[in-house]
Amino acid sequence: MLGLTQHAQKVWRMKPFSPEVSPGSSPATAGHLLRISTLFLTLLELAQVCRGSVVSNRPFITVWNGDTHWCLTEYGVDVDVSVFDVVANKEQSFQGSNMTIFYREELGTYPYYTPTGEPVFGGLPQNASLVTHLAHTFQDIKAAMPEPDFSGLAVIDWEAWRPRWAFNWDSKDIYRQRSMELVQAEHPDWPETLVEAAAKNQFQEAAEAWMAGTLQLGQVLRPRGLWGYYGFPDCYNNDFLSLNYTGQCPVFVRDQNDQLGWLWNQSYALYPSIYLPAALMGTEKSQMYVRHRVQEALRVAIVSRDPHVPVMPYVQIFYEMTDYLLPLEELEHSLGESAAQGVAGAVLWLSSDKTSTKESCQAIKAYMDSTLGPFIVNVTSAALLCSEALCSGHGRCVRHPSYPEALLTLNPASFSIELTHDGRPPSLKGTLSLKDRAQMAMKFRCRCYRGWRGKWCDKRGM
């Protein structure tokens, strides 16, 4: 199996771990899935060649991942994101041709524990049936993505447990404790150190088999989709209250992320989260927080099997778990900071509870029309102009380390964005001055698209 360790391959092929989760899968279905799995290597190599998506050879895009069509159908409030060059599904649904996200109940038989400690589908990846999961996943993907040539974002949102043992702290510690109980029950005479070592190994290998195997199946069925997991990689730079907060990812986190090479190698896109916690309000630490989270994603992407893998951070327009919309400066610290580092784009996620009232829908529309939309036009236009001016239209502009505060935004002395009120896109007026070009050349450099090279991305070749 492509991308799996020997132990994970064994996990993949072995019979279901837990009899309680396998009755729903007929022998014919399981056998069909296993026959499909034997073709993965060939098909995945083919998928690598066939890849092409909504982000191909575009310097920066924004993708809408919010069900704001509800605002129109229920309250008559039209939150039109398309006029600001935001990619969205038809009727702005969570699942569609441009963007599909799978939550744990929507893809296969993901094992997890409830808040009260009850196991669902076996609870642990090493105690659940991967064959049963893939049989259900096969059907779920076909139902959610009926078009075989789907070329949008394909995001899997699994948050109950993390594939590295060391990252399962606090409420996720139950996955470590139950893993050790599983080993202890089989080997009651083993010392605690040996039990933990075996439990750690079993959990991590099974987690790899589940996560990599699910990606592989998606990539075989919809090879042009940008398959990846929400929230990966993480940086865990949440010590905001520290007086000398730098935002840097702890060394042990980077070391653990290095052990997830199988995940970065298997992903067709990386979707780190840069949601701004409420604790960052008024602290002036948001940019440092976002900067290092994006840097970590770019770091693991560059050393992966495909250094061109798109990085698409997830952004919220609200401070996390609040009803406070981000002010313009925080959009600069999140969307703007991401664009300046040369990511392929960003996903704008909106919780469904934000569209539950007419008032909240009206607030989102006003924010989109007055603040978010114009800023997206600004950043998207600046990224395109910089790509054409510096990178021959064949690469993205990436901020030079010597100018850590530089953002990819238009010079207001050279450009103006004129908003309309009749449903038409805003108009951008102006041209790059010689000074603008000189500033870009000083503060940014090029990261070439696949198939281009050279300082200015003007030469063919990898």
From Swiss-Prot:
The keyword Hydrolase applies. This is Hyaluronidase-1. Gene3D superfamilies: Aldolase class I (3.20.20.70). The gene is Hyal1. The active site is at E159. It is an enzyme of class 3 (hydrolase). May have a role in promoting tumor progression. May block the TGFB1-enhanced cell growth. It comes from Mus musculus (Mouse). Its EC number is 3.2.1.35. Optimum pH is 3.5-4.0. One of its GO terms (molecular function) is chondroitin hydrolase activity. One of its GO terms (biological process) is hyaluronan metabolic process. Glycans are attached at N98, N127, N244, N265, N378. One of its GO terms (cellular component) is cytoplasmic vesicle. Residues 446-457 form the EGF-like domain. SUPFAM superfamilies: (Trans)glycosidases. It comes from the Eukaryota. PROSITE patterns: EGF_1, EGF_2. Residues 1-52 form the signal peptide. It is found in: Secreted; Lysosome. Disulfide bonds join C71-C361, C235-C249, C386-C397, C391-C446, C448-C457. It catalyses: Random hydrolysis of (1->4)-linkages between N-acetyl-beta-D-glucosamine and D-glucuronate residues in hyaluronate. Keywords: Disulfide bond, EGF-like domain, Glycoprotein, Glycosidase, Hydrolase, Lysosome, Secreted, Signal. Highly expressed in liver, kidney, lung and skin. Belongs to the glycosyl hydrolase 56 family. PANTHER family: HYALURONIDASE (PTHR11769), HYALURONIDASE-1 (PTHR11769:SF23).
